[in-house]
Amino acid sequence: MKKVILIKYGEIALKGKNRHLFESSIIENIRLAIGEGAPPIEQCRGRLYLQLTTEKDISCYREALKRVFGVVGFALAYRLNLEINLEEMEEVLIKHLRKLESKSLAFRVDTRRTVKSFPMDSMEINKKLGALILQHFPKWQVNLNNPELTIFIEVRDEGLFIYTTEDHEDGLGGLPVGVGGRGLLLLSGGIDSPVAGWTLLKRGMMIDAVYFHSFPYTGEKAKEKVIDLARVLTSWKLRAINLHIPYFTKIQETVNKMCPESTWTIIHRRFMMRIAEKLTKSTYHTLITGENLGQVASQTIQNIAVINQATNLPILRPLISFDKNDIIKIAEKIGTFRISKRPYEDCCALFAPKNPETKAKEEAILKAEENLPLNELINEALEKMETLRIKN
């Protein structure tokens, strides 16, 4: 008998011929989350399990698994040999349930048997173990439809696994980072963009980030804030993040000098898209923003459409329909909210017009841009760009 952590994964099991690639990714990510000294991870037909060397490892592994996208749930389980008889199974199970003896629980036994050569079928195991449990815990009752406690028995080629709902914890779900392509996140110091990046990590995308810095208008504290946000995202990506910081000051100064005030934000955003597209080359497949429909005056569908026209790359806006309260809840959960609330504004906030355009037309924006030295400004922003490799 051995103690293991049994790991369940969800959507990966639906991926057909590519399934092994998804499984390899989730195994790699579990190892990265645990760090040095990660135990062997074995596969068993829709499950993974970690071998436990000492009891002190359990809480460490549990915390690590809570940060791995693709993990639907996990449980501390007993792994027994398939040659085990009913009496030995009873001994292990009852010993495990003793900690709940004082409670009056409604329970059920739920057996999954993939090894058809096992001498008892699922129904027989359920009935026999259920009867034995009632003998040991007479205050308990069987309830198949609405149990307070479910005892799971999984009979697999690799062994017989026993665990309960008391041993089980939910995971993040989603897909393992690394299977969903690569994206470049436009990361500001606000609440929304880090959450947008996190939601794409949850869909398996490998992300890096770009932050548009307008020194001296936005100071070092604003930059440090964004670096700290990127560092939080690395703890979910489980890898370093490349943070590109183009020089954006001259672009904003030039736009604000040469273009109508109402168009400033839209033209700034179009410059951001052009610069981000230059950064992607063959490395990234998409841009990601934290834009949210109607949240601020510049984020109307008309303005978003005009901003899109500055690039040929797809732009993912995963928060486009979210309520602000829902975004804040995620930000609190993932650890970015307090950082985002630091009182240092980004370049968009500092250069915002008093009366921004809310229904922009491409012709009017192109007219406003026609005297701008677009290529010169973009090239200078990239030449003076700083790139930081942010590690957790």
UniProtKB/Swiss-Prot annotation:
This protein's pathway reads: Cofactor biosynthesis; thiamine diphosphate biosynthesis
**Keyword Cytoplasm part of the UniProt annotation:** yes
- Tell me where on the tree of life, at the top rank, the source sits: Bacteria
| Root EC class | transferase
Q: Which UniProt keywords apply?
A: ATP-binding, Cytoplasm, Nucleotide-binding, RNA-binding, Thiamine biosynthesis, Transferase, tRNA-binding
Q: Where would you find this protein in the cell?
A: Cytoplasm
| Primary role | Catalyzes the ATP-dependent transfer of a sulfur to tRNA to produce 4-thiouridine in position 8 of tRNAs, which functions as a near-UV photosensor. Also catalyzes the transfer of sulfur to the sulfur carrier protein ThiS, forming ThiS-thiocarboxylate. This is a step in the synthesis of thiazole, in the thiamine biosynthesis pathway. The sulfur is donated as persulfide by IscS.
Record family assignment:
Belongs to the ThiI family.
What is this protein identified as?
Probable tRNA sulfurtransferase
Q: What gene, per UniProt, encodes this protein?
A: thiI
